[in-house]
Amino acid sequence: SHFSLAYYKNNKWTIKQFNRFMEVVEALKLNDINIQTLHICNSPAFLNYPNMHLNGARIGSAFLGRVDADINVGLKKIGKLKCSIEEIKIVPKGFNIGYLNSYKTKKETRIAIVQLGYIEGFNIGTRQDMFRFVDKLRNLSHSIKSFFKKQNLKVTINDKKYNIIGKLGMYHMAIDITNSDVKIGDFAYLEVNPLYIDSKIERKYV
C-alpha cells in the first residue's frame, strides 16, 4: 500500500485508498487475524492526514526535510557536502571562468577552487514527470519563474555565503571570495540532497 496523492489535503482518492485499507483490516479481524502494527502513511500523508496515522507510519523524505505537502511543519533540510579549499587565485578583470566561458570577471577577483562538482551529487535533481497536462503546466510555470529569478549557487565558508561563479564542473568549482579572509584549508559547505550523493563520499552522521 502507498498513497499516490497524499501531497494534497482532503483528497478524495487518498481518502478512498485509506477506506479500502481499513476494509481489508476489518475483513482480517473477522477471520481472527489481528495485525499488531498498522501503517499506511508515507511522509505527505503523515503530515496532511493525522487521522490516518493508526499506530505506525512509514516516513521517508520527511527524514531529509524534503517532503512535498500542503502543510508547513518547520522541517529542516539535512545533508551537506564538506570539502576543503585547495587553491586560491587572483585573476584580473575580464578573465573567463568555467566551461563555455560562462562567467567573465567584472573586476580583479579572488577565487577559491574546491575539488568537488556535480559528479559528487551537488546541484543534481530528478527529472520532472510530465505525464499529465497539469504537470506540464506546473513545470512550465516553475521554469518561467526560475528564468526571471536570479539564482546563484552558493557555498558556506566560515559561516558566510559565497557565490559559485562559472559553470559547475564535474570535479571542481570556482568560488568568488573577493574581500574575504578565506584561506587554503578552510572548509566549504554545500547543501545537497543525500539521495543524490555519490557512494564514494564518506558519510558522517551527527
Tell where the protein language model's regions lie, with residue ranges.
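Active-site loop/helix belt of alpha/beta enzymes
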Residues: S1-P92
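A near-ubiquitous, low-amplitude feature marking generic local secondary-structure context
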Residues: S4, D68, I97, N158-K161
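Short, solvent-exposed loop/turn elements at beta->coil junctions and helix N-caps
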Residues: P44-A45, L100-S102
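Residue-level signal for pocket-adjacent positions within structured domains
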Residues: I59, G98, N163
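Short, P/G- and charge-enriched loop/turn segments at secondary-structure junctions
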Residues: D70-V73, L100-N101, H142
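Short acidic, Gly/Pro-enriched loop/turn segments at secondary-structure junctions
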Residues: K93-Y99
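C-terminal accessory subdomain/extension
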Residues: F95, K104-V206
